UniProtKB/Swiss-Prot annotation:
Composition skew (Acidic residues), residue ranges: 58-68
Cytoplasmic compartment residues: 34-86
Domain free text: The N-terminus and transmembrane domains are required for self-oligomerization and proper virion budding, whereas the cytoplasmic domain is required for CD4 degradation. The cytoplasmic domain is composed of 2 amphipathic alpha helix that form a U-shape.
Function as written in the Swiss-Prot or TrEMBL entry: Enhances virion budding by targeting host CD4 and Tetherin/BST2 to proteasome degradation. Degradation of CD4 prevents any unwanted premature interactions between viral Env and its host receptor CD4 in the endoplasmic reticulum. Degradation of antiretroviral protein Tetherin/BST2 is important for virion budding, as BST2 tethers new viral particles to the host cell membrane. Mechanistically, Vpu bridges either CD4 or BST2 to BTRC, a substrate recognition subunit of the Skp1/Cullin/F-box protein E3 ubiquitin ligase, induces their ubiquitination and subsequent proteasomal degradation.
One of the record's GO cellular component terms: membrane
Phosphoserine modified-residue sites: S58, S62
Protein name: Protein Vpu
Keywords recorded for this protein, A-Z: AIDS, Apoptosis, Host membrane, Host-virus interaction, Inhibition of host innate immune response by virus, Inhibition of host tetherin by virus, Ion channel, Ion transport, Membrane, Phosphoprotein, Transmembrane, Transmembrane helix, Transport, Viral immunoevasion
Region feature Disordered, mapped onto this chain: 52-71
InterPro entries membership: Vpu (IPR008187), Vpu_cyt_dom_sf (IPR009032)
Coiled coil region boundaries: none
Post-translation changes: Phosphorylated by host CK2. This phosphorylation is necessary for interaction with human BTRC and degradation of CD4.
Length: 86
């Protein structure tokens, strides 16, 4: 066992450590990006729900929430409540 460790060059260990570090950074970056997407989607869903509730209560849609929602999803004119099956 000691002979096996003596044959391992320290450069291989350093390269393996660097590769593992790069892989860890890539994985955590992807996880963070997906987490941000999830938070954004939850916020959009909350705004859609609030807009629908206000439209049901008042008979018209809330322009403030619709405008905020359209800026979040980068659309000019978002017509969420023009669905025939509501």
């Amino acid at each position: 066992m000691v002979d096996l460790l003596a044959k391992v060059d320290y450069r291989i260990v350093i390269v393996a450590f660097i590769v593992a570090l790069i892989i860890a950074i890539v994985v955590w970056t992807i996880a963070y990006i997906e987490y941000r997407k999830l938070l954004r989607q939850r916020r959009i869903d909350r705004l859609i729900k609030r807009t629908r509730e206000r439209a049901e209560d008042s008979g018209n849609e809330s322009d403030g929430d619709t405008e905020e929602l359209s800026t979040m999803v980068d659309m000019g004119n978002l017509r969420l409540l023009d669905v025939n099956d509501l």
